[in-house]
Amino acid sequence: MPNIKWFPYTFPNRLNDRPVVEITLHFLPADEIQYPMDIAPIRQCLEQGGILHPNEVFPADPLPNDFTGWYTSLLVQTALLFQSKAGHRVGYYTVCGDPDQSERSALMEHEQCDVGMTAVKLATETISGERKLLAKPFEQFSAFAVDRLLPVDTGSIIAVARRRGIPAIQLERQPYRREQFDHLTGGDCIRRNGLLMLGHGAHQHVLDGLFCLDTSDDFKRLLNDKQGRRDLLQGTGVPVADSGRDDGGAAQRYQYLLVNGQVVAARPVPDGSWAEPGTLDHAVVEHLLQVAHALGFAAVAVTVLTGGEVVDFDLAPRLDQHLESSKNMVLLERAGNLLVDWLFGDVDDTRMPVIAITGTNGKTTTARMVREILACAGDRPGLVCTDGVYLDDKQVSDTDECMIAGHLKVLTSAAVNRAVLESHHTGILRYGFAFDRCEVAICTTVADDHLGLTVRTVEEMAVIKRALLERAMDAAVLNADNEHCLDMVEHLTADKVCLVSTSSVADDLSHQGPEGGTCCCVLESVDDEDWVVIYDTIRVPVVPVASMPATFGGRATFNVSNAMHAIAACYFFGYDVDAIRAGMERFRMDFDNTPGRLNFYDTYPFDVLMDAMKNPAGAAALGRFVEQIKTRGRKYLMVQARGDRDDGFIKAMGTALAGQFDHYICQTHSVYPGEPKDRAPALVKAALLEAGVGEERITLMADLSEAVDTLLRMGSEGDLLVFAPGTGQPKSKVWSQILAFEFEADAGGLERQ
């Protein structure tokens, strides 16, 4: 049988806006012989398992004529059948790939990722013939799926919200668990799988079924307090049924659903189905509205006797229990619309504006620059970057969360009003996006890094990163000096594309993007100074390069580029030049602000620079920067080579660093399981030797702390000591060791050469 792999997305992703399972199939020539294109055995298996009726159409869509397409389409349609028979409302799928190729892929909609994944597994076993008796397995699957079923009314609210552009986040789906919201629910569960957040930040409301959890605590108590509800009814002035008649008696009872002060549906109690309310007695309507008004016009089901007396009300009505047919789905939609009206009224800004950043190098520095500009403009930005998650000025996480989980910490926080979200390729590839669109997106660079089994080429990496830029609405900001960024332009739909270049002129860039929508950010001489200048509909000089401390007078050309990307993004985000200039003049590359990125320490007689460059492009940029630093002494480097990269990558790091330093200490950052620890340093050494660096100028050291201490003891007055540790913990460890070092004039260490 073909080799089949599948992987779920629960949020908008690089492939689709829906939650989907991505299925990849690798076929062998023998598969076509083993599995003739005959649907009859599969259908018989489904009928015998009680899943299909004899007269039921299956598959729903015609199967392709080629074998790989036939097999893939049948697999996906079978998995969809299992889900829909278990009550999950799914139907979308697509099959991709060339019939002449041995690899095919498909996307299949799911309502809950574990159910979707299990459905694919069961479909795979069914089509391969591994399972011929399906009754028991499907019974188990169905029970599993029903337990994770999205309530119909919750689904209706989600659909209404998304049509209006209101974010809808299901809080019982990955990456969340209901228990995380016990502070809202009190540990109670009103509707299983019905916990839902609508809106971002301060605009958010949380629903459990149709009940709004951010309503007053008094209303929450009424959910389980029958006498309290009765007391409230009596306080409204409506006629209230005697306590002896509220649970029976000869009078017929009706329940009326009101949402936002409108009667939406009615049904006979206890077992009638919801239907249009029809013509109601004026007095009954008045009584219903009095109750709804007392409850703030939320969703409420009011039970009334035929004589007009009110029996009780339910603040968390369940509409799905009494829907007789699909015709009544219109009632759900109307209820959903009215509930969203009640929550948000005419408010348009239910979303938190987002600037999203990706790229191989420079994305964290650029994200931090953007955050600084937003803060200078008086906003309260939330930031997600490699160093952690920040809500306004407070760091709430110190780990890399540049993916959905970290992004949601910002988007769901009422402490911030703008989101600056760094996204690395792993987050995009494996998880998708916490938003369906952003205002501005940036791609700083695409270069050789993180290539291997999943992403094999730089071109494939560019396509993954491009998925973020494709979600930009107002502007996409791209590095025109990087060919892979430039290739993205034709795929983008943002209102404007801004091309950033440290070397090209505006006239040349204006012809490289979509006609009428291309802007640029370039360097131009103004009064004999290099300025960052934006060309939109007008020419806008923003800030002199020399006024931005992060550029080190323009010597850190990569930071000039990072700054230009941040400036352009904030300009098209709507910030004025004064705020942008103030932010960039205030932004500095110290360890507290940009840990591991061009951090200088000048307390000793020698200068110390730490930069956690991580790939050949970063190494080359660091080398060019160091070359421009004039010293009275020598230049030394300690580099942590990445042992979790292939030989070519590691040697390219060494080649990029050759010729810039008087001595090299090579150490390793991380290794493949089973690999010798000295593999990466030895490869760097080999590359340095090939580039003409003398062997006496290269030292290999196994221990990081020893390597740092050795280099510090090599330093003398006027020297420059450069530390290039790995990202994550190593940079913090190295910086702490640098600060704790006690300089001694005759410390020794390796012989100073």
Describe the role of every protein-language-model region.
Residues 1-162, 259-262, 276-358:
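ATP-dependent carboxylate activation and anion-phosphoryl transfer catalytic cores
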Residues 294, 455-459, 495-620:
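Adenine nucleotide phosphate-binding catalytic loops in nucleotide-utilizing enzymes
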Residues 210-211, 346-388:
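Walker A (P-loop) phosphate-binding motif
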Residues 395-512, 616:
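Flexible active-site lid/hinge loop adjacent to a nucleotide/diphosphate
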Residues 107-243:
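Conserved N-proximal alpha/beta basic substrate-recognition cap immediately N-terminal to
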Residues 199-273, 281-286, 290, 335-336:
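Active-site nucleotide/adenylate-binding loops and adjacent lid/helix of ATP-dependent enzymes
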Residues 161, 357, 384, 422, ...:
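Residue-level signal for inorganic ion chemistry
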Residues 2-63, 355, 553-556, 568-578, ...:
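ATP-dependent carboxylate-amine ligase
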